[in-house]
């Protein structure tokens, strides 16, 4: 990801080194223009002398170069981060993103008599909400010595090296770290058991295993894109679908070397060029056994909340200190489809149990049905055991997930759906939970919750 001066010129739309000086000069103060002449191929020393004439001119030049020009450059070359295309953009105000998903509603049977009684009954939409907090507040420090600035104007070649060194030291460092943070989102999501896991043989071991991986990847993509949607491939068990053009595959360089892109593109029913845009090659996953990841393009929730350069001069040390601040939201959407292809014998039979609704509000003396979605990797049915914590006498839950709240219940309840994938001697429970807030039943004068 190291930046060359050709990258700098391309991003600024210039062909010569001195064009950068002139770009700064065009928007500079009259004082700057008085001392710094229009630059050309022959007057590098004259330009340098004008910039170095006093601290005011020097400060204006460095501020424009490092802050304004530098940001233009880094925004252009940031696409070198192969994951940058998934960023959502800027969020200049606030530190929290609220993500809302409205799930489909349940079918109801027509009943003419019931219609007379329930015509004005409310049906609250099945709305689910997630919050993403700003979780990166970093800065990058770079010092520019007066002597370094003088040396930069010995020749235009020196000037090119000077600019490239600044960009690499400040902005490129931030870009590399952003790439590592975005990769970490993938590994953290996997370690929390939030991916739908598809178990595969190691595709690097044989041609047969590689072919089987392609088949499973194709089948998964097709299921994610079915018109009616599915609850099977996201961490909130909402019914959603992905457009095939929005399905992206992440693989490491070793697997990429073994894959026939044309075969894989055909498997996804895409032309080669389009498919290559949907395959992102990274240097590797940190999680053991994780071979590939397939996600909807909206899975990444990465926003820039602040990109700002601050500067201060140390007159005693004869240098300038620059501080480039980068604040971001680095997260992933649990509403979006996301699948991990994993190898090894340590893949658990069940990776996640999701209880829906995850949050419920139930009146005293009333009932609420819950559903458990079991994320299994062995294609088997697994028994779900329901329980409720925090309830008073009379509050219970049935074996099929129907919660009955006691008429005098005032506590907040926790509904649990448990799948045990262990043995009698060594149980390994996988638990999904829902929170239930109990409301008073005003029609019966129930106690206030």
Swiss-Prot record:
Pfam families linked to this entry: Big_2 (PF02368)
Entry keyword annotation includes Glycosyltransferase: no
Residue span, BIG2 domain: 349-427
Gene Ontology cellular component list: T=3 icosahedral viral capsid
Top-level division of the source organism's lineage: Viruses
Keywords: Capsid protein, Late protein, T=3 icosahedral capsid protein, Virion
Subcellular location: Virion
Family: Belongs to the phi29likevirus major capsid protein family.
Description of how the protein assembles with itself and partners: Homohexamer. Homopentamer. The prolate capsid is composed of pentamers and hexamers of the capsid protein.
Purpose of the protein: Assembles to form a prolate capsid shell of about 54 nm in length and 45 nm in width, with a T=3, Q=5 symmetry.
Protein name: Major capsid protein
Species whose genome carries this gene: Bacillus phage B103
């Amino acid at each position: 990801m190291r930046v060359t001066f050709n990258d700098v010129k391309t991003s600024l739309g210039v062909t010569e080194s001195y064009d950068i000086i002139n770009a700064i000069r065009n928007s500079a103060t009259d004082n700057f223009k008085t001392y710094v002449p229009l630059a050309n191929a022959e007057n590098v020393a004259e330009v340098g002398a004008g910039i170095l004439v006093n601290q005011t001119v020097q400060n204006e030049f460095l501020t424009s170069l490092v802050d304004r020009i530098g940001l233009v450059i880094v925004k252009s070359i940031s696409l070198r981060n192969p994951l940058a295309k998934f960023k959502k953009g800027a969020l200049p105000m606030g530190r929290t993103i609220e993500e809302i998903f409205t799930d489909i509603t349940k079918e109801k049977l027509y009943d003419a008599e019931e219609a007379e009684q329930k015509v004005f009954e409310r049906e609250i939409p099945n709305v689910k909400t997630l919050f993403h907090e700003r979780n990166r507040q970093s800065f990058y420090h770079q010092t520019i010595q007066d002597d370094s600035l003088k040396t930069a104007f010995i020749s235009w070649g020196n000037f090119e090296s000077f600019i490239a060194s600044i960009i690499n030291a400040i902005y490129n460092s931030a870009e590399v770290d952003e790439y590592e943070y975005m990769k970490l989102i993938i590994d953290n999501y996997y370690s929390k058991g939030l991916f739908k896991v598809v178990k595969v043989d190691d595709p690097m071991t044989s041609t047969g295993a590689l072919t089987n991986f392609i088949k499973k990847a194709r089948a998964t993509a097709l299921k994610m894109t079915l018109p009616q949607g599915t609850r099977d491939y996201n961490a909130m068990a909402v019914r959603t679908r992905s457009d095939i053009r929005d399905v992206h595959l992440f693989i490491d360089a070793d697997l990429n070397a073994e894959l026939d892109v044309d075969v894989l593109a055909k498997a996804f029913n895409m032309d080669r060029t389009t498919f290559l845009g949907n395959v992102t090659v990274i240097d590797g996953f940190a999680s053991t056994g994780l071979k590939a990841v397939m996600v909807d393009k909206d899975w990444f929730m990465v926003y820039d909340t602040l990109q700002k350069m601050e500067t201060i001069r140390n007159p005693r040390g004869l240098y300038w200190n620059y501080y480039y601040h980068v604040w971001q939201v680095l997260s992933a959407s649990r509403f979006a489809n996301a699948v991990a292809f994993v190898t090894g014998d340590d893949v658990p039979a069940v990776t996640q149990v999701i209880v829906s609704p995850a949050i419920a509000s139930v009146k005293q003396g009333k009932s609420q049905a819950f559903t458990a979605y079991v994320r299994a990797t062995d294609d088997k049915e697994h028994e779900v055991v329901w329980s409720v914590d925090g309830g008073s006498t009379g509050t219970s839950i049935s074996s099929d997930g129907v919660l009955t709240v006691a008429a005098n219940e005032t506590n907040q309840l926790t509904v649990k759906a448990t799948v045990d994938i262990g043995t009698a001697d060594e149980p390994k429970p996988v638990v999904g939970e829902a929170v239930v807030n109990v409301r008073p039943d005003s029609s019966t004068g129930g106690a206030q919750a």
